[in-house]
């Protein structure tokens, strides 16, 4: 990997070289939930993963690591809205394509890290983000009004996807 100037990005580069990715945990503040995201999947042609919620750090990081490995093993991103169950639990997780808000408000360090590489190596600055959404203990997702409040997190899906879901619900 390229030598970084900024110590923060030097550490990220070392972790990516050793582990395949870095996972950042951003603590909750005021009314904003904590969130976790990967840095490094995009260097291998896969989306970065984002998970929003005030969840325990180690299990959340384990989820992002496992899902990243699943993507890299198959050589492709998850399909939009794909349900995955990497640990064989009772309920599936969902993976959604995200809007540019994910990059601007949640994964800014990815862009900054890639930009620092781009200036030296020509690594592309652009990247995609997919959001991992956890169900509540009863299997309900944030769109369900009965979803437990701890699991009611913003889902950063493009408006066109949401409208398509609403139309399909009305048709059935």
PLM-predicted stretches and their roles:
Residues 1-29, 43-46, 54-172:
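Acidic, proline/glycine-rich low-complexity IDRs
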Residues 32-43:
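A glycine-rich, hydrophobic loop/mini-helix early in the fold
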């Amino acid at each position: 990997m390229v030598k970084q100037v900024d110590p923060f990005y030097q550490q990220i580069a070392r972790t990516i070289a050793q582990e395949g990715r870095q996972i950042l945990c951003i603590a909750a503040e005021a009314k904003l939930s904590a969130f976790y995201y990967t840095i490094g999947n995009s260097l291998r042609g896969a989306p970065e993963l984002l998970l929003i919620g005030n969840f325990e750090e180690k299990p959340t990081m384990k989820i992002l690591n496992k899902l990243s490995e699943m993507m890299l093993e198959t050589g492709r991103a998850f399909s939009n809205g794909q349900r995955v169950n990497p640990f064989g639990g009772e309920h599936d997780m969902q993976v959604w394509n995200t809007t540019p808000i994910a990059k601007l408000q949640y994964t800014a360090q990815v862009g900054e890290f890639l930009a620092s590489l781009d200036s030296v190596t020509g690594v592309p600055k652009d990247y995609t983000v997919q959001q991992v959404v956890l169900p509540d203990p009863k299997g309900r997702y944030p769109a369900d009004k009965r979803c437990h409040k701890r699991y009611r997190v913003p889902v950063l899906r493009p408006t066109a996807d949401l409208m398509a879901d609403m139309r399909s619900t009305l048709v059935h």
